[in-house]
Amino acid sequence: MQDSIINDKIAHAYIFTGPRGTGKTSTAKIFARALNCLNPQNGISCGECENCKNFNQSPDIIELDAASNNSVDDIRNIVDSVNIAPTNSKYKIYIIDEVHMLSTSAFNALLKTLEEPPEYVIFILATTEAHKIPITILSRCQRYDFKHISVDVIKDRLKELADIEHMEVEDKALRFIAKTADGSLRDALSLLDQCEAFSIGEALTYDKTLDILGAVDTDVFSNMLRAVISENTVECMKLLEEMISYGRDLSQFVVDFTWYLRNMLLLKTSDDADEIIDMSSERLEALK
């Protein structure tokens, strides 16, 4: 995208697709800012010109959340405004989030504009479910796929923010938060804020992080494993019913139980399991 700005090879429609929390909408805004920057540096906005400073208030940047504005009338309003030239920018940019939520009629209304857009109009569509978008729309967009962010990258970013905020956080706690976020930096930041709120004035330890985030006690997993090994169906059902009564999401319980089994395998096969297993010292000893 930087190269397209440098070489002035700008498409009229882009689609950013990938899992939630991976930066699609944020990237769309960063890209839009760079497109209308008066003095871009290597394809990146300068942050100093009038267009950069007034980006959030610019009438030439139009955002639409298709999750709640998905009717044909919503899109027709956009189509009607397309013919009005930008006020003080090079491009008039439409950012449509969760675009897969648009109705069939809304997609049809959008299609004609995508086929013959004015030179100054750019559409940036963001979605978590590209397969739900009509091929007629996809074929007219330059596509970028966003992937889950690695645990290490998320952890490093959390560490940077913790240092800026002068938070004392154990490295293992940050790694657990990063893993729990499941590739979503946005979710990781939310979890870190949650942990910070419950540990004001105290160091955020790994054990405290487990308590705050409500990690299931390993005794439950241990009892479940014993019941499975002994083929005790009654005990398995009893444990599952207890999880339901506590309001536990069983699909998440399965994920956590799988992680527990992974930790057990690591204990049996790795000499440095203590460093890579996401478990408190007390629980780790119990697992051994």
Briefly describe each language-model feature range.
Residues 1-143, 153, 161:
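P-loop/Walker A NTP-binding region and its immediately flanking N-terminal helices
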Residues 50, 57, 77, 90, ...:
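Extended, largely alpha-helical regulatory/partner-binding modules appended to the mid-to-C-terminal parts
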